[in-house]
């Protein structure tokens, strides 16, 4: 059998590279400008390699009863790791993936195709523009994993954006976002304050070392109108190979502190990761 070889291509927003994993036969790492974007195992779509993807997976597994199909809107495509995961764990789900980088979409379609019958539809569009024109109450889950380079774009951080996401969700729907920050957490705290203006229930999933300010890292924001079973989620995330905590309620309000919600005119991207925090090959 031919050894898989790396693929490098200039896409709309940088240089994308697909690198085969030497340890797993049909698994690939996608980087854009050396920042890891996605890891996907074509033979085992339920395998989630990255810490933040595993945490998003735990939420997806616990938010409604296992196996029930969901309508999911993914903002940010990457190599479609989470759409493949949902298709495998919740067959019959209808999923839309919105990715602004058309070149990246083409690369993934060509080298890491999704089965025709997986119920996954790809759209080349800006995430916020798509949200603002989408049908109201059309999604059970919205997952935002959008990084321009290694930063969350400013226009996806404001109260207007949070309202747009809430409008697309059904009443019992759940919004999830992959964010990144370091102490003193100005960005993360402002994001929590922003989503608190729209959603009654908030949780944050992060590694204790990140929350204690030891290093830069990812945090998953979970927002909904209905209370979620954070105890089940906390057990799942604590038992993971990369243990994490679930903060909610009073502890989370204390973490938010005096942070103010973000208005469109004041919005800034998430902070630049320190050199080497996310870079690879």
What are these model-predicted stretches?
Residues 24-40:
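A short, structured beta-strand/loop element
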